[in-house]
Regions:
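Conserved beta-strand hairpin/beta-sheet module of binuclear metal-dependent hydrolase folds
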Residues: 1-51, 154-162
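Divalent metal-coordination and catalytic microenvironments
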Residues: 20, 30, 40, 61, ...
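Metallo-beta-lactamase
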Residues: 33, 53-65, 90-143, 149-216
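Metal-dependent catalytic neighborhoods of phosphoester/phosphodiester hydrolases
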Residues: 67-76, 92-93
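Divalent-metal (often Zn2+) His-rich catalytic cores of metallo-beta-lactamase-fold enzymes
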Residues: 76, 190-243
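C-terminal regulatory/interaction regions
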Residues: 232-294
Length: 294
């Protein structure tokens, strides 16, 4: 049984954590940020569990909105499974945390909470196509770069927990790609999308937000938006515009696309909370700069 726990990050249906019940107790896929840990504890309690019951935490990648509370479960005894390229940052998060603090400043703790290191004895680096057998369930790790070099999509039977590689889709809106720096690579992302497609899943569980069952239309739409945003940003990069100069125009561009589909201001605000415009501007401008320098 898979349960979706809404972490209510700034608004509802922004960040999900997934609770999977097994014969060896609950497994958590995605912890969300530490700032929403109390909501996750409440969600566990609704299903009869407390944090110390969770022995296995599976992360899609180490961004704060997906992995920020992993250390809190490790303190309660859980093992945390992570991509090899994310391992050292969770063991010693000082560099990761301080770099984010330079961006968020005084809002850092309010938005994301705290982050402590996870002992190596409670972490496992997971290679591509590694299999975890937990309580009668079989979780397969698929390395899926594009959004982040340390990204994993977790397969459970005909279900895939996609993190950010299958985009954000907040009902009743469309899918959009979260494109934060520093790792955005559109070519890798397209390859990862085809990897997901070729696994023939029945359901994708998006961290932002929830289940998707019309797989091919969803993935095709994601590719189309990635290409559109990428080309839009390539023009601005060619004009040598800064993140600060581009962000207002891009925010309006993305919002206008949502408005044309009939989304309300509140629904558009949910998208901005889950996928802030400035992050995609920074990520895609950096992508084009790296392409130019390659």
């Amino acid at each position: 049984m898979i349960h979706i726990i809404d972490l209510h990050f700034q608004t509802d249906h922004s960040i999900a954590s997934f609770l999977i019940e097994t014969n060896d107790g609950p497994v958590i896929v995605e912890t969300g940020p530490h700032s929403t840990y109390p909501k996750l504890v409440e969600g566990l309690a609704r299903h009869g569990y407390k944090p110390s019951d969770v022995k296995h935490v599976l992360l899609t990648h180490i961004h704060f909105d997906h992995a920020g509370a992993a250390w809190a479960f490790a303190k309660e005894g859980a093992t945390v499974y992570v991509h090899p390229k994310g391992y050292r940052h969770l063991h010693d998060p000082e560099k990761l945390y301080n770099s984010a603090k330079r961006i968020y400043g005084d809002m850092m703790e309010t938005l994301w909470g705290l982050m402590e290191g996870i002992p190596e004895t409670q972490m496992k680096a997971v290679e591509h196509e590694d299999v975890l057998e937990i309580g009668g369930k079989r979780f397969i790790a698929h390395h899926t770069p594009g959004h982040a070099v340390h990204h994993i999509a977790w397969q459970l039977d005909d279900v895939i927990f996609t993190g950010d590689v299958a985009g954000c889709k907040i009902e009743p809106g469309p899918v959009v790609p979260p494109c934060p720096p520093p790792d955005i690579n559109l070519e890798d992302w397209y390859d990862s999308i085809e990897l997901l497609r070729n696994l023939n899943p029945q359901t994708l569980y998006l961290t932002h937000y929830g289940p998707v069952t019309d797989i091919d239309p969803h993935l095709n739409a994601l590719i189309a938006v990635l290409k559109d945003w990428g080309e839009w940003m390539k023009i601005r990069y060619g004009q040598q515009l800064s993140v600060e100069e581009v962000t207002p125009d891009f925010k309006a561009y993305a919002a206008s696309g949502l408005q044309k589909l009939g989304l309300t201001p509140n629904e558009i605000a949910r998208y901005e909370a889950a996928n802030p415009a400035w992050m995609s501007v920074a990520g895609l401008l950096r992508y084009w700069k790296k392409r130019e320098q390659a």
